[in-house]
């Protein structure tokens, strides 16, 4: 049975079940649909066709009363017709190889988010970041480094935004979404191009890292960092007095984490702390791998035995002795490698002393940090996937500007991911309102950087866009193209600068651009090559060479060679008197005499008449 016949059979079974039950659920419809159908609009069309047959589709199985109200009959012919129609729908969309359609089809499988859904995902992102910050606070030296940077900025009068970007307190209160005028993403108006240029200019001129606020409140930052500093001192005293595993130290470290984790660090600071914790784990892993290779690969110790015996004994120098007590068959090899194993264990002990943590504590802190990162990463992924349609709707406005549509989409996706990182749901705006500007800026910046063969700086792109906009306005006002002088007066710019901008704004043209209807003719065929000689010049040059050779043939061999070397005839370059003298092993004065004698011979009318015609030309 062919694939299409099988699909029709499955769809007939679905319709038969609907006739028998009197209804279908969305889950049943989804289970019987072909796998290639994933676009929500296609699914809605299929459900509408099933409804037209008299079979109602419910979210969940309805009760008996609802079935009585919605009861309807279907016939066999209608079932076959619907199955054939559904199979035809599948065949139309299931075989596309267009990357844009495939991307949109996959994108359509993700449902749009409500305002509540956006807040829920944003809270999960913040929760993941707080878990990472809580784990970082447990690592010695991390909080100290942030406090040192904060104190340095306060002392030097720097910007707080170089350290932190805000706070993520774990409260449930959030402002309601404001009634913001929706962004018009359709390109229907007559002045849409002018609006696009204005938007592009404003997007390019904005700083990519500026969120439009004045940064963190200095007073609130002072209070928070003071509390963190005081709690850090308490934690250090408890650690010194009672040890890390004590109840007192654990309580103080927990309090430190509670104060530190709401601080939202800038990416540079956050990544530096994460890298610091990761570095300690990588050091542990490197020594553990070295010990495992010595035991498993070199000593032929079974891997299962190593994984059973080695954990929790990473720095125990008596571990080798405990392994040898059972006298395994690999005991002799282990004994032979004892010194190498002890050397790596000592490196682990030195690492523990350096970071003031045991190997188990380093692993536990990294595990907690990884869990928080994974939680935030999953939530960000959901937010990005649910807003991919927004990127496409914005990217459509910027087609035919030098970048392919898929490139525009990917650049917009980069802006979308940055918007997810910086989104603050407590401000009350919907995510789409905030993300629109990041997406638009990412797209316009990429067009400015990549669209032109010869890259033009962004500030010059702004000037070109402004010039084009004013030029169109003056064209509508005057009914003709404005002159550079008129543009300069309107833009308050010197005329020479206007001419430079107009020259820069010109797009390069490919030499392979076809000319006319004949595909064999290209623009390069009609452009003069100034480096090539004309046929007449080439013929004259060849005739001059031949005449010169004939004239030189009338001299002695020595005189001819001296002239050839002195004037570079049939050579790459000419030579000085001294260079020619070395060649003939005579003085430069003698070469000058030979040259003068040869030139007198050439000036004789019998010889000079052959070359005089070239001089006249």
UniProtKB/Swiss-Prot annotation:
Q: Which residues bind DNA?
A: 577-596
Organism for this UniProt entry: Pseudomonas aeruginosa (strain ATCC 15692 / DSM 22644 / CIP 104116 / JCM 14847 / LMG 12228 / 1C / PRS 101 / PAO1)
What are the entry keywords? Cytoplasm, DNA-binding, Sigma factor, Transcription, Transcription regulation
- Where is the segment annotated Disordered? 170-220
**Sigma-70 factor domain-2 as annotated region, ranges:** 383-453
Question: One matching Pfam family, short form?
Answer: Sigma70_r1_2
Listed GO CC annotations: cytoplasm
Q: Where is this region: Sigma-70 factor domain-4?
A: 551-604
Q: Where is the composition biased (Acidic residues)?
A: 196-218
Tell me the protein's name. Answer: RNA polymerase sigma factor RpoD
Under the heading Gene3D superfamilies, the entry gives: RNA Polymerase Primary Sigma Factor, Sigma-70 factor, region 1.1, Winged helix-like DNA-binding domain superfamily/Winged helix DNA-binding domain
Record's superkingdom?
Answer: Bacteria
Q: How does it assemble?
A: Interacts transiently with the RNA polymerase catalytic core.
């Amino acid at each position: 049975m062919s694939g299409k016949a099988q699909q029709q059979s499955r769809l007939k079974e679905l319709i038969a079940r609907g006739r028998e039950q009197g209804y279908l659920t969305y889950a049943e419809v989804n289970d019987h649909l072909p796998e290639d159908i994933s676009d929500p609009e296609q699914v809605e069309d299929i459900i509408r066709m099933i409804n037209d047959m008299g079979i109602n589709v419910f979210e969940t199985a309805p009760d008996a009363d609802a079935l009585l109200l919605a009861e309807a009959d279907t016939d066999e012919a209608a079932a076959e017709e619907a199955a054939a129609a559904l199979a035809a729908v599948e065949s139309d969309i299931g075989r596309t190889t267009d990357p844009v359609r495939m991307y949109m089809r996959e994108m359509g499988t993700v449902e749009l988010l409500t305002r509540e859904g956006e807040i829920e995902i944003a809270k999960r992102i913040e929760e993941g970041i707080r878990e990472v910050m809580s784990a970082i606070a447990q690592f010695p030296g991390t909080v100290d480094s942030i406090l040192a940077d904060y104190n340095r900025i306060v002392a030097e009068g720097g910007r707080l935004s170089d350290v932190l970007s805000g706070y993520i307190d774990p409260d449930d209160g959030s402002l309601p979404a404001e009634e913001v005028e929706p962004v018009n993403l359709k390109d229907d108006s007559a002045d849409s191009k002018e609006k696009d240029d204005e938007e592009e200019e404003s997007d390019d001129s904005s700083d990519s890292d500026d969120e439009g606020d004045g940064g963190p409140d200095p007073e609130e930052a002072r209070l928070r960092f003071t509390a963190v500093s005081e709690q850090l001192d308490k934690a250090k005293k408890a650690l010194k007095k009672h040890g890390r595993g004590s109840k007192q130290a654990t309580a103080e470290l927990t309090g430190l984490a509670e104060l530190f984790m709401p601080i939202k660090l800038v990416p540079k600071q956050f990544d530096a702390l994460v890298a610091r914790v990761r570095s300690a784990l990588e050091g542990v892993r490197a020594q553990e791998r070295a010990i495992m290779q010595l035991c498993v690969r070199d000593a032929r110790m079974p891997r299962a035995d190593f994984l059973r015996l080695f954990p929790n004994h990473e720095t125990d120098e008596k571990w080798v002795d405990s392994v040898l007590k059972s006298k395994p068959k690999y005991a002799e090899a282990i004994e032979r490698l004892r010194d190498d194993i002890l050397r790596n264990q000592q490196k682990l002990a030195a690492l523990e002393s350096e970071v003031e943590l045991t190997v188990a504590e380093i692993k536990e802190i990294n595990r907690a940090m990884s869990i928080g990162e994974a939680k935030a990463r999953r939530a960000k992924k959901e937010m990005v996937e649910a807003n991919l349609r927004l990127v496409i709707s914005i990217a459509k406005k910027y087609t035919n500007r030098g970048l392919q549509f898929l490139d525009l989409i990917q650049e917009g996706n980069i802006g979308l991911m940055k918007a997810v990182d910086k989104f603050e749901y407590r401000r009350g705006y919907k995510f789409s309102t905030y993300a629109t500007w990041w997406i638009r800026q990412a797209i316009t910046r990429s067009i400015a950087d990549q669209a032109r063969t010869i890259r033009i700086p962004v500030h010059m792109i702004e000037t070109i866009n402004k010039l084009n906009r004013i030029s169109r306005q003056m064209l509508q006002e005057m009914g003709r193209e404005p002159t550079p002088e008129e543009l300069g007066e309107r833009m308050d710019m010197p005329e020479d600068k206007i001419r430079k901008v107009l020259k820069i704004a010109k797009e390069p043209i490919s030499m392979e651009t076809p000319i006319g209807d004949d595909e064999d003719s290209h623009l390069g065929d009609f452009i003069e090559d100034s480096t090539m000689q004309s046929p007449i010049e080439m013929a004259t040059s060849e005739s001059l060479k031949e005449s010169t050779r004939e004239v030189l043939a009338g001299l002695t061999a020595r005189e001819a060679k001296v002239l050839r070397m002195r004037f570079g005839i049939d050579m790459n370059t000419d030579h000085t008197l001294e260079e020619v003298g070395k060649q003939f092993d005579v003085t430069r004065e003698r070469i000058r005499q030979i040259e003068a004698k040869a030139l007198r011979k050439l000036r004789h009318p019998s010889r000079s008449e052959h070359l005089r015609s070239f001089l006249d030309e």
